[in-house]
Amino acid sequence: MKLKHYILTIAVFLCILGCQTETPSCDTVIQGGMIYDGTGEQPFEGTIAIKDDKIIYVGKHKEFEATSTIDATGKAIAPGFINMLSWGYGNLKNDGRSLSDLKQGVTLEVFGEGTSAGPKGKSGDEKYLSFGAAMDTLEKSKVSTNVASFLGAATVRIQHIGYANRKATKEELVAMQITVEKAMKEGAMGIGSSLIYAPGDYADTDELVALNKIASKFGGMYISHMRNEDNKVLDALDELLLIAEKANIPAEIYHLKTSRKPNWHLLDTVIAKVEKARAKGLRITADMYTYNASSTGLTGVIPTWVQEGGHRAWINRMKQAEPRKRLLVDIRKELAQ
């Protein structure tokens, strides 16, 4: 009987040991912070565990054996933010730490609003820089943030037409589509346009549709600073929706807004049209500023007819009396809209 009792005791003890779970291990555990997990749900206090540079747990409080523990009590924890419209390419080439973005929580910088770092120069020339090579330059320099880029629609136009304000020929469109295909194969996210700046606004709707049809074949998307953001914003939105439909491509509106107080009421109609297009099956999204002001450079105020031919032609044109008179009239008219 004693032997049976002893064996039973051992068995129960082993069973209890078997039921106990080991505390999982990780390299870094973050405890006590309010977690905003990116789903849109309410934040919650919990635990995040990281192992081998991968997040292995996000959830309610849980114990981990960790090499490093971060107490985030009183702080917010969120996935890295995406800078959807970054002009940091040049700065990153000079200083890849990206401190200005990292200190604001940005971990991905996306380039390509209208123009992109490549392609530049003539294909075959020693100084030619392809889209892929431009992005590889940053990757090889080991910049701190992740980087991605759209192919600038204006960059494609400059490659084949320059700064002329005219419609692309059929031959030029074919060449432009080849450029898009090459860039998409090199990792472009799609086509980015900025249609209030020269030479981007020299492109008509047909040209933009042609470029986006190629991007669509590679699973790309179209993102656009629309052609107008004031009293003609609805026409500009119609153009974006048409491009999305004809090219069968998802489209996003850069920094959706209506500029100048007389046009603020139009934003309700813009949003309603976007929702209607989405209900129809078009894949339309938008991003917005988190503040109530916008800014731009001189190129956003100077009419694009002045800028035709590039900077040197622009400067020379502004030195002439008649163009200067017309310029002042057009600027005043634009700012009054």
Residue map of PLM features:
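Short acidic, glycine-rich surface-loop motifs adjacent to enzyme active sites
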Residues: 186-195, 253-255
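Bacterial N-terminal signal peptides that target proteins for export
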Residues: 1-7
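Histidine-centered catalytic micro-motifs
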Residues: 81-91, 195, 222-228
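Polyanionic/metal-chelating signatures
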Residues: 120-127, 131-138, 143, 154-166, ...
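C-terminal motif of bacterial Sec signal peptides marking the signal peptidase cleavage site
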Residues: 15-18
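Alpha-helix-loop-beta-strand connector modules within alpha/beta enzyme cores
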Residues: 142, 205-224, 247
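Histidine-rich, glycine-flanked metal-binding segment
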Residues: 22-28, 35, 39-80
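Divalent-metal coordination cores built from histidine and acidic residues
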Residues: 72-77, 81-86, 92-190, 212, ...
